[in-house]
Amino acid sequence: MGEAQLLVEDGNQKLFPCEVCGRCFATDVLERHGPICKKVFNKKRKPFNSLKQRLQGTDIPTVGKSPQPKVQPVRKSNWRQQHEDFINTIRSAKQFTLAIKEGRPLPPPPRPTSNPDYIQCPYCMRRFNETAAQRHINFCKNQTSRPVFDPIQMAARLVSRAQCKAQASLKK
């Protein structure tokens, strides 16, 4: 305690600062405070859980959620296929512009490439990623199950309705 510097003299008591926290105490109090202060400052404090504090005293049960690591599937890189598609598209565009300049017939368009990760809709044969395919297939199923109105039949019905209305007006 001799090496601690006298900080404040409060009335007739001399106060000395704590080496750990810097607060001032009398010598007899500082002897008791020192070991406790060192122990407190060396401990790691748990982060305060405000949810637990708020739910305390209520009937709402606290359910401990275990953090689940998000496992994302590792997708294989298909950059080479994309690169080849890009090169073929550029080449076909050059052939197209050259055919227009020279007046030749236009070359056939390049074949569309299909992504193997996409899912094909069984109703319209279009391809979608997984999440879009789930939504689309339900939609497309509902659309294909709806009755299709033939324009010829609709015209015939309209004519027959008009005739019925004409006959009904004549009877009145």
UniProtKB/Swiss-Prot annotation:
| Residues holding Zn(2+) 2 | C121, C124, H136, C140
Q: Which cofactor does it need?
A: Zn(2+)
Alphabetically, the GO molecular function entries are: zinc ion binding
Q: What is this protein called?
A: Zinc finger C2HC domain-containing protein 1B
Q: Which family does it belong to?
A: Belongs to the ZC2HC1 family.
Q: Which UniProt keywords apply?
A: Metal-binding, Repeat, Zinc, Zinc-finger
ZnF start-end (C2HC/C3H-type) = 14-43, 117-146
Q: Tell me the residue numbers annotated for binding Zn(2+) 1.
A: C18, C21, H33, C37
